[in-house]
Curated annotation (Swiss-Prot):
This is Bifunctional UDP-glucose 4-epimerase and UDP-xylose 4-epimerase 1. Ubiquitously expressed. Highest expression in stems and roots. Keywords: Carbohydrate metabolism, Cell wall biogenesis/degradation, Cytoplasm, Galactose metabolism, Isomerase, NAD. homodimer. Heterodimer.
Length: 351
């Protein structure tokens, strides 16, 4: 496809799980990309794999910068040497449990980092942003599917940073109407690039279901803890909307194109999910099918603050962004397993 004039995109947190997959799609779509990442929850190997995936020609259009959004000088350095057409802002801490134990770290990283980014963008007159929000801004929704105009509420400090940052975006855009900001509320990103060469590789014990299942499947962890088996759902386990990371990556490109095409976008939120709810136990069964491995489970009490069922209404993104998730649970598990099987220790390549 390619853009007629090469547009230059800054991707914060571009070495992370969703970042790497989005960078691959951006490069393939003809964009130039600069990544800024501090490797808090990622590694340089992930960026090297992205380069291998896209090949030497497209790799020339990817520029990596080690930096931290909490240090304004790191952002300033980037903006002073090149012009960016837009920013995709992934960088942030994302573990609910850790945010409850260490809220200051979350406020410092997620809020201060983002405010520094806005300040620098404004200074250099780059006023287009795609922001990583989250379905956590719906709290425990009274009804499902979640629609973008629902009342928002956060259940924990992580969710609160996402909610605050949405409000900050709305306030900035209202005061300075030339800004164009799209807030993408992700549901539960899973899967991996179909090549099996990039995927999710969290540091420490995984906080999310799929990397946890994956580590059990490859023998890194003995069993999967299933939190809550007495929810009012068909099998008693919690229901979530899992979305393939490649669908998510394409959603970011659809959002970018919307920013460039629609001067009246203002500050608008879109759900990125499949619109389908899948229970934890259904996901385990699908992964067992894809991998041919048995996943031993341990039923544990519910975690406080976990909702029974959350899934997206996807109509708004379909109608306004022309985007719809293509992949189902079987493909998510197939690609997750390919990544896990090729890289049992993630990017560390331990034997």
């Amino acid at each position: 496809m390619g853009s007629s004039v090469e547009q230059n995109i800054l991707v914060t947190g571009g070495a992370g799980f969703i970042g790497t997959h989005t960078v691959v799609q951006l490069l393939k779509d003809g964009f130039k990309v600069s990544i800024i990442d501090n490797f808090d929850n990622s590694v340089i190997e992930a960026v090297d794999r992205v380069r291998e995936l896209v090949g030497p020609d497209l790799s020339k259009k990817l520029d990596f910068n080690l930096g931290d959004l909490r240090n304004k000088g790191d952002i300033e350095k980037l903006f002073s040497k090149q012009r960016f057409d837009a920013v995709i802002h992934f960088a942030g801490l994302k573990a609910v449990g850790e945010s409850v134990e260490n809220p200051r770290r979350y406020f410092d990283n997620n809020l201060v980092g983002t405010i520094n980014l806005y300040e620098t963008m404004a200074k250099y007159n780059c006023k287009m942003m795609v922001f990583s929000s989250s379905a956590t801004v719906y709290g425990q929704p009274e009804k499902i599917p979640c629609m973008e105009d629902f009342e928002l509420k956060a259940m924990n400090p992580y969710g609160r940073t996402k909610l605050f940052l949405e409000e900050i975006a709305r306030d900035i855009q209202k005061a300075e109407p030339e800004w164009r900001i799209i807030l993408l509320r992700y549901f539960n990103p899973v899967g991996a690039h179909e090549s099996g060469s990039i995927g999710e590789d969290p540091k420490g014990i995984p906080n999310n279901l799929m990397p946890y299942i994956q580590q059990v499947a490859v023998g890194r962890l003995p069993e999967l803890n299933v939190y809550g088996h007495d929810y009012p759902t068909e099998d008693g386990s919690a229901v979530r909307d899992y979305i393939h990371v490649m669908d998510l990556a394409d959603g970011h490109i659809a959002a970018l194109r919307k920013l460039f095409a629609d001067p009246k976008i203002g500050c608008t939120a879109y759900n990125l999910g499949t619109g389908q709810g899948t229970s934890v136990l259904e996901m385990v069964a699908a992964f067992e099918k894809a991998s041919g491995k048995k996943i031993p489970i341990k039923l544990c009490p519910r975690r406080s603050g976990d909702a029974t069922a959350v899934y997206a209404s996807t109509e708004k993104a379909e109608k306004e962004l022309g985007w719809k998730a293509k992949y189902g649970v079987d493909e998510m598990c197939r690609d997750q397993w390919k990544w896990a099987n090729n890289n049992p220790w993630g990017y560390q390549n331990k034997l």
